Swiss-Prot record:
One of its GO terms (molecular function) is glutaminase activity. GO terms for biological process: glutamate biosynthetic process; glutamine catabolic process. This is Glutaminase. Keywords: Hydrolase. It comes from Pseudomonas fluorescens (strain SBW25).
Length: 302
């Protein structure tokens, strides 16, 4: 496995320079584009890494999975009264569908859906940002994970569209807390800094029927785990989820920080990171690396 990871990174490295680092969040635009890392964590505790797997990066929309899990843990099936679990087929920050469907987001991984989930968690936790930070520290086994306040502030200064979505949902009665307070939590969740190693470990419960592979803690039930994985498979890569299913064949979640996490149910979790994105907002080299890895080991669930 170790040799394979190194070989795959060598194969995809020529793609660096063909994508574009996210620049609509200024703090992300400054990230050096020539970085590439991958980490694999097994249900048996085995761990492999290559490249810049220990380098911290902004998780961005990958945090939406953590938020969803917190909401499911507290609210169970009741959360689906406020949002769906269907693919959107629209850009992650689109408002057209949200208006047409009267403020009920299609799924928890588009921005509107993630904001509803944050609204749910805002009602539950006294200090949502600290609750999220402590949750990911526990999942990853890394007590040093922090929020990058510069990235969070940068997002807040360029978050008008997210605010518009929140107020639109509030007008339909599907947003209960103060919009600014929820946005503050949301931007801080996205600004969590983690490495490929951290994320592969943190997602291990999704490959292990809801139980963390490194701590033994039950995070979700087996049924809830299948539900989260199914939403990742259909909606986890913005409007490129179908292409990811075709090429990689695994549940996954990406972020505009350049990270992608993929789950091999019953076996492994994988995180790859390269900051340059393709036109859909997903890591260009990361997508190819996961495609090659899945193909060579036969990991596709299809």
């Amino acid at each position: 496995m170790q040799a394979m990871l190194s070989s795959i990174l060598d194969e995809v490295r020529p793609l660096i320079g063909l994508g574009k680092v996210a620049d609509y969040i200024p703090a992300l635009a400054d990230v050096p584009a020539n970085q590439l890392g991958i980490a694999v964590y097994g249900n048996d505790g085995s761990a492999y890494r290559a490249g810049d797997a220990d380098t911290l990066f902004s998780v961005q929309s990958i945090s939406k999975v953590f938020s969803l899990v917190q909401a499911i843990d507290h609210g169970g099936e009741t959360i689906w009264e406020r949002l769906g679990h269907e693919p959107s087929g629209q850009p992650f920050n689109s408002m057209v569908q949200l208006e047409f469907e009267r403020g009920r987001p299609r799924n928890p991984f588009i921005n509107a859906g993630a904001l509803v989930i944050c609204d749910i968690n805002q009602s539950r936790f006294a200090v949502p940002i600290l609750s999220m930070r402590d949750f990911v520290r526990r999942l990853s086994g890394n007590p040093h994970i922090l929020v990058n306040s510069v990235v969070a502030e940068s997002e807040a200064q360029h978050g008008a569209r997210n605010a518009a979505m929140a107020y639109l949902m509030k007008s339909f009665g599907n947003f209960h807390n103060d919009v600014d307070a929820v946005l503050h939590s949301y931007f801080n969740y996205c600004a969590l800094q983690m490495s490929c190693v951290d994320l592969a470990k943190a997602f291990s419960f999704l490959a292990n029927e809801g139980t963390s592979a490194h701590s033994g803690e039950q995070i979700l039930t087996a049924r809830q785990t299948r539900q989260v994985n199914s939403i990742m498979a259909t909606s986890g890569l913005y409007d490129e989820a179908g292409n990811f299913a075709y090429r990689v064949g695994l549940p996954g979640k990406s972020g505009v920080g350049g990270g992608i996490v993929a789950v091999v149910p019953g076996q492994f979790t994988v995180c790859v990171w390269s900051p340059e994105l393709n036109a859909a907002g997903n890591s260009l080299a990361g997508m190819k690396a996961l495609e090659l890895l899945s193909e060579r080991i036969g990991w596709s669930v299809f």
